[in-house]
């Protein structure tokens, strides 16, 4: 099976899954369209509320899309498919790359849907700002992709929904996806150590300085550099490649 064929197969699996359709696409889109019309003229985090909440809901849906490959990995493990792959011509690297690319493709679809809704509800950015915000969001998803792969190879298929749900919802909530919980003090300092904070605030970063400050890049990089080796170790342990 060629790499592109396997990516296509994984993408179809993702898009046929009702959890992906609901959590990555429907939920953030519906919440955005319900909340924003009544708050079109509000200001949050120094930017128009429609822009802030568009970025927040796009980040929330994209987090689900990024971590979702873990669910497919867990299902494959429960059926013995992960170990069976070792005796097929499909290389392990191809399998992992397909999962990662699928995560990002689903995330891009989420961003496109929320961008369209935002534009229809008054969000106005120039082309460079749209691209810059998209770039920040995709970079910020790296820890979630790694977390999904790690959880998929470690947690049982029955326990995985709770594990993934707790991880995404907690980080999204603390990061400000459903409204800023902390605007000052020690708690704000703590939540700035989460990658979800910088995902949610990608819009205000683009409108302000055009990018995250150094602190944001460091936080996302540290999370990615910590979770990626864990994902690799989980995969090797699960498949017997130790």
Where are these regions (language model features)?
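Alpha-helical transmembrane segments and their short interhelical loops
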Residues: 92-166, 170, 213-221, 228-229
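Transmembrane helix segments
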Residues: 34-41, 152-193, 197
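Hydrophobic alpha-helical transmembrane segments of multi-pass membrane transport/permease proteins
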Residues: 15-41, 49-68, 109-110, 163-173, ...
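Short alpha-helical transmembrane interface motifs in multi-pass membrane proteins
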Residues: 20, 51, 62-67, 97-99, ...
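Hydrophobic alpha-helical transmembrane segments of multi-pass membrane transport proteins
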Residues: 30-31, 49-121, 166, 172
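Short hydrophobic, aromatic-rich alpha-helical segments embedded in or entering the lipid bilayer
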Residues: 1-8, 177-217
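Alpha-helical transmembrane segments of multi-pass membrane transporters/translocases
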Residues: 34-36, 201-242
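N-terminal Sec/SRP start-transfer signal
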Residues: 1-21
């Amino acid at each position: 099976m060629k790499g592109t064929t396997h990516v296509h197969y994984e993408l179809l699996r993702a898009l046929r899954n009702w959890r992906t359709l609901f959590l990555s696409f429907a939920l953030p889109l519906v919440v955005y369209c319900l909340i924003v019309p009544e708050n079109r003229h509000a200001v949050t985090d120094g930017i128009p509320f429609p822009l802030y909440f568009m970025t927040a809901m796009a980040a929330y849906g994209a987090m689900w899309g990024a971590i979702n490959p873990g669910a497919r990995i867990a299902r494959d493990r429960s059926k013995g498919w992960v170990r069976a792959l070792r005796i097929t011509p499909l290389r392990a690297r191809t399998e992992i790359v397909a999962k990662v690319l699928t995560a990002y493709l689903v995330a891009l679809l989420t961003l496109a849907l929320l961008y369209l809704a935002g534009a229809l509800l008054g969000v106005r950015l120039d082309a460079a700002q749209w691209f810059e915000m998209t770039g920040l969001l995709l970079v910020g998803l790296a820890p979630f992709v790694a977390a999904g792969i790690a959880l998929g190879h470690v947690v049982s298929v029955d326990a995985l929904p709770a594990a993934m749900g707790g991880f995404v919802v907690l980080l999204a909530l603390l990061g400000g996806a459903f409204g800023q919980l902390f605007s000052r003090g020690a708690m704000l300092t703590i939540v700035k150590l989460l990658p979800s904070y910088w995902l949610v605030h990608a819009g205000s970063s683009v409108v302000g300085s055009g990018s995250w400050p150094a602190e944001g890049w460091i936080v996302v990089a540290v999370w990615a550099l910590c979770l990626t080796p864990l994902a690799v170790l989980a995969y090797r342990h699960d498949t017997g490649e130790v």
